């Protein structure tokens, strides 16, 4: 996420002063965060809260905009009108605002399916046009794949196949004819290409800015992917370190943010990026000990409301000895602890608006009286947004 923020900061002074070259001053005293960083951090804050509902995201986004009403470059006119109104309905935007705020989602989940699902949710609150949704999903997917060791070729092929973007161009081909374009369709592919053409983190940022146009958003999207792929410090050329007299671009990025934004970014890295889960995917032989034998179990009347369902999917909690968490794959929610799978559940949304458990399986290690409740109570929540929506029968906790 810091890569996205730094890209925004670097591109901030070139948005209305396009330079069409990679040879420029990376940072100076005028370089600052814009609406791209504010909204990126707002989404990260929402993820930290754990209650992954659209209503909570709308509340969080509007709170951030009202606290930072006049960033460099301003907000988009339709978005600003929405943010300062009592109206919460989306306005069918296809703009790149959905993609420039989604970086944190690429770091927060354990499967590509989860990542794309939540990216869609973050877009839909404002950018519910198919192109707006696609731009957010493609950006988050690229970040997820980059941080989970996919190659550039694998990322390119997946994004082209799934989202239909043409990524076979080069920055040198794009640069001479590229102009300001605020659409996802005219920003996200170019930002991904800047990453694909790069050799290290800094080069990726420079390539994105050199294209011209909406430089802060281009570099924000590129920077989010490049950080996940390269890291921000280890790939820096020596000239950057000596010229700017700092070793870590992470530190320089953080130092250009207000204290309360610094706090959210730091908490996001400590809680989500650096949580060091012991378990990543059910087919990962490096983390699963032994073959799992699934035993179908008897169902009881268990259901979750929309907010609790999404929060269950996100749950992750450190325990005194090990850790447990939830991930989604093949239509099931898998609950694990340490290196062992415990249970898996299949939910279905029914006519009453709740998600009901329609299938349930356990392993020999999954002997918990009520694992769904256990996960939600001890899971991934930040006060004062503690879990409160679990429903058993007609009783709500």
Feature-to-residue mapping (PLM):
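Structured, active/binding-site neighborhoods that engage oxygen-rich ligands
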Residues: 1-275
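Short, well-structured alpha-helical interface segments that form or flank functional binding sites
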Residues: 98, 134, 186, 321, ...
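Charged, low-complexity, helix-prone segments enriched in Lys/Glu/Asp/Gln
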Residues: 119-123, 308, 373
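Charged/polar interaction segments and conserved charged motifs
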Residues: 273-290, 365-373, 394-397
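Negatively charged, low-complexity tracts enriched in Asp/Glu with abundant Ser/Thr
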Residues: 274-330
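Amphipathic protein-protein interaction modules
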Residues: 332-366
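Polybasic, proline/glycine-rich intrinsically disordered low-complexity segments
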Residues: 353-397
